[in-house]
Amino acid sequence: MKNKFDTLTVETGVKSKKKYPIYIGKAILNLLDKVIPRNVSVLIVIDSRIARLHRDKITRLIEFLTESRTVNQIIIPGEEDSKSLSVSESLYEKAASLNLDRSSWFIGIGGGVVGDLTGFVAATYMRGANLLHVPTTLLAQVDSSVGGKVAINQSGYKNLVGNFYQPKAVIIDTNFLDTLPIRELRAGLAEVFKYGILCDRELFLTVKSLFEDCEPLNNVSWERYSYLIHKSCEIKADIVSQDEIDTGIRMLLNLGHTFAHALEGATSYNYFKHGEAVMWGLAMSAELSYKLNKLTYKDYQAIAELPELTKVPEVPIQVKDPNIIEELLLRDKKKTGEELTVILPTSIGSAEICKCPATALIKVILES
């Protein structure tokens, strides 16, 4: 019996009209056989946690693919430190030693770190090999695996070296959520909140109800998670189809992220999960928008209460140093002079791109 799955299509590039599918379902790793051609070489980059917790599943997958392909694997820690030139170099060396060429396939099985790293290596190996994402965290499933952003960190800057490189497909198997810690589920839902604030009030309220019901997040049904994943990917795919390289409407997807990146940097990238920092970033964006008379008090309150409602970690005292915050904000890729491009909600369901002085953002962070 074949497992059921949903399919979305991402269209990229107004001129090139490239397309790729997103498959969403439970126990659907067999779809890799449908996507990857026969008689090609495959290098699978696997998050070490996934390799340990899903060893039998990964072993069966590799055996299945090996029947008609040459398959090798490399296991890396799914930590931010792995998004580095040194780890990238080890992947290049592995690929070269296996005589991989441009017809070969790189598959990333893991969270955002593995996806970013694998995508970066695939994009740059021989100027571009085939890429396929199998995201295993909720955050990667609803956000980072879709849209083609690939990058590594360098010189203390997050995602300093990167590009836009689209995968051939994204396969989202919700079975991986069964072993995901509650903290990771909570972090992933921050990005779903983001999509709701951007353009779908009903989605925002649906996610909020998960926390108001006080049901443990690891008891939520896979069907409910599949719905949230589908809605999130649908929204992101629509935005990416209009602006693949982040020069216009796609910038809206940065809602909460200017604040979040500063919070992550101020805590050395080892205190907050990315989604937890985004949760605070959403609240801070709402506060700034309310102070600029762009957001009603009712909607401001609904967004501002998210960190408390979702029980993400508090903002620690070291974030209260204005000099550190200013330095981090001025590293932002969306900076122009002393001004930052920041996304501000104008309601739960809409947002706009604004220019704000760094001092305005610093004040919001210090008062948090």
UniProtKB/Swiss-Prot annotation:
Recorded metabolic or biological pathway in which this protein acts: Metabolic intermediate biosynthesis; chorismate biosynthesis; chorismate from D-erythrose 4-phosphate and phosphoenolpyruvate: step 2/7
Cellular compartments per GO CC: cytoplasm
GO MF: 3-dehydroquinate synthase activity; metal ion binding; nucleotide binding
Keyword flag Zinc: yes
Claim: rRNA-binding is one of the keywords in the record: no
Residues annotated as binding Zn(2+): 191, 257, 274
Record localization: Cytoplasm
Class of enzymatic activity (EC top level): lyase
Keyword line: Amino-acid biosynthesis, Aromatic amino acid biosynthesis, Cobalt, Cytoplasm, Lyase, Metal-binding, NAD, Nucleotide-binding, Zinc
Single GO biological process annotation from the record: aromatic amino acid family biosynthetic process
E.C. numbers: 4.2.3.4
HAMAP family: DHQ_synthase
NCBIfam families (alphabetical): aroB
Its biological purpose: Catalyzes the conversion of 3-deoxy-D-arabino-heptulosonate 7-phosphate (DAHP) to dehydroquinate (DHQ).
Homology family: Belongs to the sugar phosphate cyclases superfamily. Dehydroquinate synthase family.
Name of the protein in its database record: 3-dehydroquinate synthase
Organism name: Natranaerobius thermophilus (strain ATCC BAA-1301 / DSM 18059 / JW/NM-WN-LF)
